[in-house]
Amino acid sequence: MGSTRLPGKSLMPLAGKPLVYRVLERIIPARNIDQVVLAIPDSAENRVLSEIADELGIAVFAGSEDDLVDRYYEAAKIFQADYVVRIPADNPTPQSSEIDRIIEHHLGLSIPGFSSNLAEVFGSGYPDGIGAEIFDFSLLKDSWQSTYEQTKREHVHLNFFDYSRQIPVDLNWCPISTIDCPTDFARPDLILDVNTAEQYRYMSTLYDDLYPKNPNFSILDIIAWHDNLN
């Protein structure tokens, strides 16, 4: 709710429901997530988000407004998570099958680490916004105890991996891994998150066009729609 670039974006409508509702309803079908938790800032203006989660039967944790590392750590501790799967609340088109794939990959690793298909990682080819990050609770706890930089407290992934520069923070401490995007939707040019008014207009049009035909529209449907825009 407190986004500086697009205030109130979590409640902006997509095909008649708030953006955050659309994010959550697309996560629910993921088979490899034991429990979905909406981690929100503990402030009066964000209580409406709890009502949306309640509508979908999803648990809520309210924590620090600005310290996301603390919010995630406290939520993971309360819900006794061995692994944390992070899906940003401004990505309205997550694909549950790709979330399941990155979780399966991560659970097969022999040591704690950070895995992501949330966006392109090391040339994986993923569109920005259909996957997830997963990391071990032990690494989140280490970050919670030792990270003091404000930017890293506000952006959890920067404790592990910098997407913009494709640079791991410390491979000796936290191995970084990904999976290859299936070739039929390997489109790293697609940005499917909502951070600006222009991106919201794009996503609103996408939902208006695709959701009534198929509420479970896939990334292949998105690509076909996107490529026919012009």
Indicate where each model-derived feature is located.
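N-proximal accessory regions
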Residues: 1-18, 58, 81, 99, ...
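Short active-site loop/helix that positions an aromatic residue
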Residues: 200-209
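N-terminal glycine-rich phosphate-binding loop and ensuing alpha1 helix
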Residues: 1-40, 45
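Conserved core of the sugar-phosphate nucleotidyltransferase
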Residues: 94-190, 205, 227-230
